[in-house]
Amino acid sequence: MKKGTWDDDFYTKKAQKEGYPARSVYKLEEIQQKFNVIKRDFKVLDVGAAPGSWTMYIMKLLGEGGFLSAIDLKPLSITVKKPNFFFLQGDAFDQTSIRMLAEKGPYNAVVSDAAPSTTGNRIVDTERSIQLIESIYNTALQVLTPGGNFVFKMFQGGKEKEILEDMKKHFNAVKILKPQASRINSFETFVIGLGKKA
């Protein structure tokens, strides 16, 4: 069995066993363990939340005193009936949606595992990814509190350098990580902005 196949199988089965709808939860878990981006009682915005693995994990981290807003075009495959959770089924590009989410803030952390619909054409997919990242990044800068943290997915081969250089102007530290739970053949990496500057 190829290593990539084994890894995919391992994390998928682990997610099923632990009750998460997708293996992506272990990407955020590793980021959290290394960088502590989400703390108890934080206000957090989750962009591209479906099917809901990150949402479940974040709610466990926050406790009753925290608050989570989440948005996705698709519905969540989980049910969260808690007063400190708000889900908006909508478009993260839409200004009305952004205003609704901003009203629930400001946020101590913005996290995103969002990815555009893919075509199989790496150039097209990378460009779509960049457009999505720029939209999420602009939203994060609007809604984050000073000292806030930002996590997002980026595909290699795009405008990484420009985005990272701009982030250094707005965050005290910028880190890059390809989590172990990412598929072996995936071009994805995660960018972590720590401590938004005032």
Can you name each region flagged by the protein language model?
Residues 130-146:
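A short glycine-rich, Lys/Arg-flanked "PGG" loop and its adjoining helix->strand segment in the class I
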Residues 67-72:
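Conserved SAM-binding motif I beta-strand of class I
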Residues 51-64:
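Conserved SAM-binding loop of SAM-dependent methyltransferases across substrates and taxa
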Residues 64-65, 144-149:
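Short glycine-dipeptide loop
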Residues 40-50:
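Conserved class I S-adenosyl-L-methionine
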Residues 156-198:
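Class I S-adenosyl-L-methionine
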Residues 1-40:
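Class I SAM-dependent methyltransferase Rossmann-like catalytic core
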Residues 74-117:
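S-adenosyl-L-methionine
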